[in-house]
Amino acid sequence: MIEADRLIEPIASVEDERVDRAIRPKMLQDYTGQQHVKAQMEIFIPAAKNRGEPLDHLLIFGPPGLGKTTLANIVANEMGVNIRTTSGPVLEKAGDLAALLTNLEENDILFIDEIHRLSAVVEEILYPAMEDYQLDIMIGEGPAARSIKLDLPPFTLIGATTRAGALTSPLRDRFGIVQRLEFYNVADLSTIVSRSAHFLNLTIDEEGAFEVARRSRGTPRIANRLLRRVRDYADIKSHGVVNQQTAAAALDMLEVDSEGFDIMDRKLLHAIIDKFMGGPVGLDNVAAAIGEERETIEDVIEPFLIQQGFLQRTPRGRIATDRAYQHFGITKDQTKD
């Protein structure tokens, strides 16, 4: 099982959520990166407001930690409406969803995180709600049970997921707007780090922000978490001031290397290179070799390694790329010895 305190884990901790609420941007003009998403939402939101209509239902997907919840809250702020937040696993019964829907006001937003984890029963309730703003509910039990329709105010459903492929086609097709969030480039992450440092009352120069950003795996949540640990280091070692040397020393101490890899990333790549001669190797064999669940490897560890060109998924299995060998200073001949 993956370590719960993995520093570059993109899943939010309680501390992350507390700090994120304080420093996350509130409006699109303050939203850094994801230019393709930002450009589209700068059209869709004013258009809906000008017509006095709710925004079309919005699906946001992408790896964890990229700002799906942040974007949902920005949409609510830009639309000037309330947002009610829940998650797929919390909505166990149809009544749980019905209670939320019936308490929405006109043009409000219902945000469902991890929407791919909705039960089939709850999902069925969503269909008429999304299409016709109607709620079909059963009253009574047995032979006396009857179905009644309740009218709902127009609303926007925003769904967020790390696994868009796990959504059923009927649900996915009901979203009028679909946005994919990509990993951030280092320049945009540097801007985010500098902005967060301001909110944390931390003095950091451009080179220091860049050093934190380049080790943050393209993920704002990780950048902000690393920044808090760098702040701790700087408070003790450099009078609370962060430059490139301070940031590098802090992150080296935390065993986050120049590519943003931690021990789990290195363990995965070393297993493929050392135990399976670079691959191809099946996911189950990799999972057994490093003692990790295949879902964790697939959803948490691999996406960044693949996106950065250190790992390939092929029909025959996983393959470590030339870049992975170069990162560790290993030649392919060495693995054959």
From Swiss-Prot:
What CDD domains does the entry give? AAA
Which sequence ranges are marked TM in the entry?
none
Keyword tags: ATP-binding, Cytoplasm, DNA damage, DNA recombination, DNA repair, DNA-binding, Hydrolase, Nucleotide-binding
Region (Large ATPase domain (RuvB-L)) residue ranges read 4-184
Domain note: Has 3 domains, the large (RuvB-L) and small ATPase (RuvB-S) domains and the C-terminal head (RuvB-H) domain. The head domain binds DNA, while the ATPase domains jointly bind ATP, ADP or are empty depending on the state of the subunit in the translocation cycle. During a single DNA translocation step the structure of each domain remains the same, but their relative positions change.
For this chain, the family text in UniProt reads: Belongs to the RuvB family.
Descriptive protein name: Holliday junction branch migration complex subunit RuvB
Q: Which organism is it from?
A: Colwellia psychrerythraea (strain 34H / ATCC BAA-681)
What gene name is given for the protein in this entry? ruvB
